[in-house]
Amino acid sequence: MRAVMGININATARSLLLSEFVSAFFLAMRYFFQPKPTLNYPFEKGPISPRFRGEHALRRYPNGEERCIACKLCEAVCPAQAITIEAGPRRNDGTRRTVRYDIDMVKCIYCGLCQEACPVDAIVEGPNFEFATETREELFYDKAKLLANGDRWEREIAKAIELDAPYR
């Protein structure tokens, strides 16, 4: 670093020649002519992790019977108290099924504890993140809506559970 009469010559030369400006300009031009890394969201969708927590769904067994055994573990573990379950009477074989299974999606914090607590993988958070509504009442999911979501997203949900299996 050379200084003449208290003036740093290197810093003065850089500021007079605008070297930072020129290097920034060339850097910007290099990125200007490359393909853009951003996505055109509504038309292009990015990759979703197998652990993504989106819209809730109730799954069925391959024979069509619903998986939920009305153990109410998901209701007990929900920190937001967004899940309400009513169990039906015991059947002849000793099993139970739900009569009512409601999730208030406005209360839900999408923590995934309900999915972790479920012993039969009945309640899952699926890959759907586009479920905006016009009214709050539409975000109150009943059993029929949850089962419809499960039927709609079963292929993607099963694939995500399979990919996540080594980490469970």
UniProtKB/Swiss-Prot annotation:
Domain 4Fe-4S ferredoxin-type intervals: 58-88, 99-128
Its main subcellular localisation, reduced to a broad class, is membrane
State a GO cellular component annotated for this protein.
Answer: plasma membrane
InterPro entries for the chain? 4Fe4S_Fe-S-bd (IPR017896), 4Fe4S_Fe_S_CS (IPR017900), NADH_quinone_OxRdtase_chainI (IPR010226)
State the source organism's domain of life: Bacteria
What is this enzyme's EC? 7.1.1.-
Reaction catalysed by this chain?
A: a quinone + NADH + 5 H(+)(in) = a quinol + NAD(+) + 4 H(+)(out)
Q: Which GO terms describe its molecular function?
A: 4 iron, 4 sulfur cluster binding; iron ion binding; NADH:ubiquinone reductase (non-electrogenic) activity; quinone binding
Q: How is the cofactor bound?
A: Binds 2 [4Fe-4S] clusters per subunit.
Its placement in the membrane is given as: Peripheral membrane protein
Q: Where does [4Fe-4S] cluster 2 bind?
A: C78, C108, C111, C114
Keywords, A to Z, come to: 4Fe-4S, Cell inner membrane, Cell membrane, Iron, Iron-sulfur, Membrane, Metal-binding, NAD, Quinone, Repeat, Translocase, Ubiquinone
Q: Where does [4Fe-4S] cluster 1 bind?
A: C68, C71, C74, C118
- State the Gene Ontology BP annotations: aerobic respiration
Family, as annotated: Belongs to the complex I 23 kDa subunit family.
**Subunit structure, interactors included:** NDH-1 is composed of 14 different subunits. Subunits NuoA, H, J, K, L, M, N constitute the membrane sector of the complex.
**Protein name, as recorded:** NADH-quinone oxidoreductase subunit I
Q: Give the originating organism.
A: Bradyrhizobium diazoefficiens (strain JCM 10833 / BCRC 13528 / IAM 13628 / NBRC 14792 / USDA 110)
